Amino acid sequence: MNNNSRNNENRSTINRNKRQLQQAKEKNENIHIPRYIRNQPWYYKDTPKEQEGKKPGNDDTSTAEGGEKSDYLVHHRQKAKGGALDIDNNSEPKIGMGIKDEFKLIRPQKMSVRDSHSLSFCRNCGEAGHKEKDCMEKPRKMQKLVPDLNSQKNNGTVLVRATDDDWDSRKDRWYGYSGKEYNELISKWERDKRNKIKGKDKSQTDETLWDTDEEIELMKLELYKDSVGSLKKDDADNSQLYRTSTRLREDKAAYLNDINSTESNYDPKSRLYKTETLGAVDEKSKMFRRHLTGEGLKLNELNQFARSHAKEMGIRDEIEDKEKVQHVLVANPTKYEYLKKKREQEETKQPKIVSIGDLEARKVDGTKQSEEQRNHLKDLYG
């Protein structure tokens, strides 16, 4: 029985596969496309009118009444419909359709004075007969009351964003943006810039400028030109006047000193001139080494102390020893910091000077115990 049931199942699967292959050949379909790609989703809106009566989620695709075979992958075809963008080729730039940021005015229904107490228009949709908390419409974020200029009583009208925009327009990051405030800010900046240029000191023109030789001569004479152009004495009283900064021609860059010398003392990478105060040349590597400062100097001193302490303890570099790890600075930084600090304190600590009189025996000072106190202590402690 089991073998017969298996054979029947195999025959049914073979027949079903043959049937599907035959249908795919007739409809010119690719049988290797999975079902979740071939089937149209339930929310797909571009189904042809001939297929409206049929559920789009079926595997089989119907043919049109005229005999044409419909595209079973129509929901994967990108077509420009209803003003949508054609994004088949994303490598080419395309101009968008723009954002329609429009509003529509919703005026409340006219009501009598008698009904105005019991009825009020909705601030959300603008209709009368219910309040905003009872409104069944979708809550709108952009709500605004604007005066109605056409009305004599100046009744308010509700300004609501238009809802006929497509999804791309509503989800755009610039949706609802108005550049009016930014334009006003830019115009204010331009006005301030023009006023600043107009109010700038006009005396600073080409006539007040002079060459470098004249500047050096004026500095040697302790004179300088003020904002008007007249010469002033260089003293503390006239220090607030206009004065230009100058640089003497005798000044020259430090790297120019190496032009006629065989050695180059200027380091272009660090832009420093090699001097004895900055560092020295290493004899082994023939490289210029800067003097250590700050934490680098402290680490170097601590490393030297660790090396000397290891030699005192009998540790040698050429001999392999398990205890060598205990005398490495990297493995024991806190230990050597403590030892170095302790040794410095011992060196700076002055020996205490004790006189001979302090070491001599002295007579005991104090109150002598009475016989009664001795007997009492003897009874307590035996």
Curated annotation (Swiss-Prot):
Name used for this protein in its record: Pre-mRNA-splicing factor SLU7
UniProt modified residues of type Phosphoserine: S120
Sites bearing Phosphothreonine, chain numbering: T212
Effect on the protein upon substituting C122A: Affects the ability to associate with the spliceosome. Loss of growth and in vitro splicing activity. Cryo- and thermosensitivity
Organism: Saccharomyces cerevisiae (strain ATCC 204508 / S288c) (Baker's yeast)
Function of the molecule: Essential protein involved in the second catalytic step of pre-mRNA splicing. Involved in the selection of 3'-type splice sites; this selection could be done via a 3'-splice site-binding factor, PRP16.
Residue numbers spanned by region Disordered: 1-72, 362-382
Localization (cell): Nucleus
InterPro entries: Slu7_dom (IPR021715), Splicing_factor_SLU7 (IPR039974), Znf_CCHC (IPR001878), Znf_CCHC_sf (IPR036875)
Biased composition (Low complexity): 1-15
GO biological process, any: generation of catalytic spliceosome for second transesterification step
Region feature Interaction with PRP8, mapped onto this chain: 200-224
Similarity remark: Belongs to the SLU7 family.
ZnF (CCHC-type) ranges: 120-137
Biased composition (Basic and acidic residues): 46-58
PTM note: N-glycosylated.
Any one Gene Ontology cellular component term annotated for this protein: U2-type post-spliceosomal complex
Gene label: SLU7
This protein's record includes keyword Transcription regulation: no
Domain notes: The CCHC-type zinc finger probably plays a role in the ability of SLU7 to bypass the requirement for PRP18.
Subunit structure as annotated in this protein's UniProt entry: Belongs to the CWC complex (or CEF1-associated complex), a spliceosome sub-complex reminiscent of a late-stage spliceosome composed of the U2, U5 and U6 snRNAs and at least BUD13, BUD31, BRR2, CDC40, CEF1, CLF1, CUS1, CWC2, CWC15, CWC21, CWC22, CWC23, CWC24, CWC25, CWC27, ECM2, HSH155, IST3, ISY1, LEA1, MSL1, NTC20, PRP8, PRP9, PRP11, PRP19, PRP21, PRP22, PRP45, PRP46, SLU7, SMB1, SMD1, SMD2, SMD3, SMX2, SMX3, SNT309, SNU114, SPP2, SYF1, SYF2, RSE1 and YJU2. Interacts with BRR2, ECM2, PRP18 and PRP22.
SUPFAM superfamilies on file: Retrovirus zinc finger-like domains
